[in-house]
């Protein structure tokens, strides 16, 4: 076999191994530091899914009653996933995983001997270390094992890439999403909201999008900052001016060419040519 061909095949194999390391080397365990990270969630938003979009991540609170997967009574779970570079499903990175019971009791992870252990904080302020909440990674999911299947809320922080937020339909029902300061939607070329909604309000320079009865497989919001709109408008005006300038230059060149033709007689009207007239007395 040609040496270059062999090296090429080896390189492709290493690339495939690197890209799919989750499949070849196993999913790995969640980082204890991720699970024990501190985050404050809005437990009283009053919707089935509350999504707070920040510059670098999304803090989310989901009502576990209306989730679309993991409904096994013996092992209730909430399963998170994202899309890889080849559009394959892969486990989603979660940080600051917390749970809140309907009565206000909360569960969060704390670091104990280098491991993340779930600690229950009761409404009277007392705490207890109990294994009621756990997280594992499979080849294509990050699975949160819930304390209960019937009620409660799950709070997680998820990564965000650029100015787009895309979520599978983890729960059905009402959604609301707060975008970062100065973020807006509305210009088709710069933004997208799917499924669409006309329920949009602005408070403290943050746009709030709301949906009722969501059962779509995916929720996608792409937004722009107001300064992006000014930049885009400036570019559009610049492109228009360049186009007008080009048209004016072309028009002037055309007029100059016509003038030169007239000067050398190339545009003389053939009806005025004496050679085409009949001899005298025969006209």
What are these regions (language model features)?
Residues 1-102, 272-282:
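N-terminal pre-first-transmembrane soluble regions of secretory-pathway and organelle membrane proteins
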Residues 1-30, 177, 203-283:
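Hydrophobic alpha-helical segments
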Residues 29-41, 105-169:
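Non-cytosolic head/periplasmic domains of membrane-anchored proteins
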Residues 55, 160-163, 259-260:
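Context-gated lysine
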Residues 61-68, 112-113, 147-150, 212-216:
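Secondary-structure transition/turn motif
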Residues 72-128, 169-195:
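Solvent-exposed beta-hairpin/edge-strand motifs
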Residues 91-96, 123, 154, 221, ...:
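Generic hydrophobic, helix-prone segments enriched in Leu/Val/Ile
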Residues 128-148, 157-231, 235-237:
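Intrinsically disordered, low-complexity linkers and stems that provide flexible hinges
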């Amino acid at each position: 076999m040609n040496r270059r061909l062999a090296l090429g095949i080896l390189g492709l194999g290493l690339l495939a191994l690197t890209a799919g390391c989750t499949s070849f080397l196993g999913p790995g365990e969640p980082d204890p530091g991720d699970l024990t990270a501190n985050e404050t969630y809005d437990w009283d938003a009053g919707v089935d899914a509350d999504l707070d979009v920040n510059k670098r991540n999304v803090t989310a609170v989901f009502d576990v009653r209306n989730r679309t997967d993991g409904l096994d009574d013996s092992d209730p779970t909430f399963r998170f996933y994202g899309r890889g570079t080849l559009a394959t499903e892969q486990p989603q990175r979660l940080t600051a995983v917390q749970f809140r019971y309907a009565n206000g009791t909360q569960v969060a992870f704390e670091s104990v001997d280098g491991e993340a252990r779930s600690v229950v904080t009761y409404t009277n302020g007392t705490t207890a270390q109990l294994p009621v909440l756990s997280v594992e990674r499979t080849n294509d999911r990050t699975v949160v094992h819930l304390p209960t299947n019937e009620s409660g809320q799950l709070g997680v922080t998820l990564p965000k890439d650029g100015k787009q937020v895309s979520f599978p339909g983890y729960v059905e029902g009402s959604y609301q999403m707060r975008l970062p300061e100065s973020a807006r939607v509305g210009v088709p070329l710069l933004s997208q909201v799917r499924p669409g909604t006309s329920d949009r309000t602005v408070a403290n320079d943050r746009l709030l999008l709301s949906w009722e009865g969501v059962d779509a497989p995916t929720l996608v919001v792409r937004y722009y900052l107001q300064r992006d709109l000014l930049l885009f408008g400036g570019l559009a005006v610049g492109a228009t001016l360049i186009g007008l300038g080009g048209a004016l230059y072309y028009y002037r060149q055309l007029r100059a060419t016509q003038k030169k033709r007239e000067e050398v007689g190339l545009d003389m009207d053939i009806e005025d040519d004496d050679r085409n007239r009949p001899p005298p007395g025969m006209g």
